[in-house]
Amino acid sequence: MSRSHHKRLGMPRTWPLTRKTNIWAQKPNPSGHQLEMCMPLGIVLRDVLGIAHNMREAKRILHSRIVMVDGRIETDRARGVGIMDVLTVGDENYRCILDKNGKLRYRPIAKKAAGSKICRVMGKTTVKGGKTQVHLHDGRNILLDESPDYKTGDSLVISLPDQKVSSHLEMKKGSTAYLTGGSHIGEIAKIKDQE
């Protein structure tokens, strides 16, 4: 049986939490995001956004059903909120991104921007009936009737919460990229060349 907590000294470096104030930190439930690229919803409400003073208040906020992740109501405090996810608390909207120090941050965004999300294509498979299934970085699988020219590494802009593909962003020379690793983590750059 897996553990529901881990020690703060061993938590991922991307989490913007103090390590020596408490011993334990809630672990996110398994999801499509990697452990390093998401944080539990309860910790986000309590420690990052400061909406709740303790986990008991965070649970009450969640059970009042005013918190949404990617346009869907969430009541699980261990649900992982990962990179590019849209978090809505009441009338406030936030997007999870990486800052220049490699820490997960929740930046306020406009209501119009909260209706869409950018997802990276991690793979494609052909399923029964000749349909194409696209696998995205946050664990989503989108089934498409036609076979589009989506390649691994490209990004899709999907509308929330209905998950319809609204546009396709190719990874090619001259495109804009958001860096999620390396020494320039959290920066936006132009692709000069591709190997």
Where are these regions (language model features)?
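Ferredoxin-like alpha/beta domains used as RNA- or RNAP-binding modules
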Residues: 1-195
